[in-house]
Amino acid sequence: MTILPFLAAVFVLQLLSTLTVAEIKSFTISNDSRPVILLEKFGIIEIGHVTVSVSSVSVLSPILDSSKLGFFVLSEESLPHVLLELQQNFSFCVLDSHYILHFFTFVDLSPPPRSQFSKSYPITSPNDYSLFFANCVPETRVSMKVHTEIYHDLYPNGSRDYLLAGSAQLPGLYLVFFLCYLSFLCFWLCFCWNHKQIVKRIHLLMTALLLVKSLTLICAAVYKHYVKVTGTAHGWNIVFYIFQFISVVLLFMVIVLIGNGWSFLKPKLHVKEKKLLVIVVPLQVLANIASIVIGETGPYTQDWVSWNQIFFLADITCCCAIVFAMVWSMCCLRETSKTDGKAVKNLAKLPVLRKFYVLVIGYLFFTRIVVVVMKMKADFTYQWVSNAAEEIATLSFYCLMFYMFRPIEKNEYCDVDDEEEIVELSLK
């Protein structure tokens, strides 16, 4: 095994592994020739177990050496030592290292046609671990069915906790934020009811956004609870992905519509705003599809890194399109006021627009950049902190946005004299 494939796998591990979840998983590896395959990343804070079962193993190789094909667990502390061994000898097989937790090799497999084996390994040292499959035989392709179970033995009665270090707090965290959003929704509904004479269409869309966000969080809490207790989601992952998809698309639609003054400054969207929606919505659809694929598979999938790249590019492109449209819209409004007398008095609305644009840019920067850095840098026992930071930032953004554009009579952003002025103010 050369050092380059192993370094590539380690790089992917450090960059993207916060997206993997330690639970019960079953997957198939088909005709794969990769020298090393990252199967799972997990953290253990007390006594834990790793169980790996393989079946229907098939190997295509010109020179078969079953002892050079197998599974191992590598701790974060041992990683530098293994890299040093590979640097000193490029042909060194990582399965021969003294720094790994050796699981089993294909020598242990039962005879064909079943070709299966299962082993459970106790882990008693708290650390950040990674489960790998190594193929040290050149030009060898492997196909097999793999079943993994990773859990904590926390209770004397033998019950298991499948949400490992850094994720065990997620069910309670999502439940708390669900209650926050539910209270927010009730307050918003009461406020809109008391001001129903001036409620606009955008306020109805904002109400739908709050409702779907609340449902997303309660589904996330139930989803993580079932994974924690049983190791599987029992279908709640599908419900969660549906509401998450609707929530994200609604959020970006609300941002675009508010930023362009729909139902506040003008009764309908113009061509440029419609084009922006045509760009933003499909990009978010693509990003959500990529997010689902990433969440439901893992680094053992050959195109997993590509899906991560698709998610990142689609999401960042969408955010950049929104920021560019906001800045361009403000510049156009400022230039229009120099030649249009009726538009001059509406420059008073620019400070409010500017505040909203700064709020959006700050929110996008924090959730897309700062949170990702937190996930990469945080200790494995504090991975949940990045989730908490993201939810706090999102709730704060919602509160400020809803406060700025609440349905009141004297709203400096919504106060427009008449429909004729609205049409003249519209950016063509």
UniProtKB/Swiss-Prot annotation:
> Where is the signal peptide, in residue numbers?
1-22
Molecular function, one GO term: G protein-coupled receptor activity
Annotated transmembrane regions: 173-193, 202-222, 238-258, 276-296, 310-330, 356-376, 385-405
Glycosylation site positions:
31, 89, 157
List the Pfam families hit by this protein, alphabetically: CAND6-7_N, GOST_TM
Subcellular location, record wording? Membrane
Q: Which PANTHER family match?
A: LUNG SEVEN TRANSMEMBRANE RECEPTOR, RE59932P
Q: Which family does it belong to?
A: Belongs to the LU7TM family.
Q: What does this protein do?
A: G-protein coupled receptor. Plays a role in plants and microbes interactions.
Output this protein's name: Protein CANDIDATE G-PROTEIN COUPLED RECEPTOR 6
Q: List the source organism.
A: Arabidopsis thaliana
By which gene is this protein encoded?
CAND6
